[in-house]
């Protein structure tokens, strides 16, 4: 880090405090806990300049704890998705944004700094993960109440879809419980990618990661990114490589998790829907056509992971009485055919409507015969 970046800006503005590339950008300068109080013992050896490094800090004005995380380098190749992401109020509403010199935005109390190579995210410290909260309240929590808490997550996914961004890491550890008023909150945008790069192996390395929360159609493209190409094929346009397109015929037709029960989506429907999409994708003459066909439904990639999350959490509840249409709608969310899945806007609308059916807990009634205080007693005449 250069010396100019480590001293306060002119006019007493924000300064960088910390060690090396793990510095925080805040005013007044916060304490960055790197070695003394590590928040998470995670390996950052494979991430340049500590991208993904997690810090714990104290609030600027009030005594509150917040999470600070570097998510991206501000270079022309990696910063193109940051601006629309910052416009989505998926994080807490208290986060303020200011545009920097490159036309992007920085999340947090930061000032323009064109030389900065990363940005910092400020997030509130959560009470529990979604699984921990459901496990601790499993005896009295109902599915409609669970859906009510998921409304902020559904709205966040809808905003991301409008901004043409895929969260790409919607798992149980990234949905945190804040409070009864705020519900669950979606966090961790370290794997977020532009929607247009979803099926491009050169821009989406997670196609080959084979994560369980990724939709089944990813399995049809991940081999193309890893298959070796000869010098003759390398000189051709990758999108027109018919040799790689032919590999689709040998991929399996059943890729859903075994944990998904038949009450959400019967096995025969799983096979029929997967076969229909498989045949539609394999019938495309070129890889470019197949990619364009799958790209039409990229907005529903997060829908699949969100459906898996609802399945996992609902299975942990003791009071598993679901509202009408719950299993049928979630079965559409986890369909192997993205054409069957609802859009994020439809998911948000359905969750809001289903949560409205949950009776809100009324405050406890006052005692029927309250005892009068001693000082209120009156003497007999």
What is the predicted role of each segment?
Residues 153-160:
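Conserved hydrophobic alpha-helix
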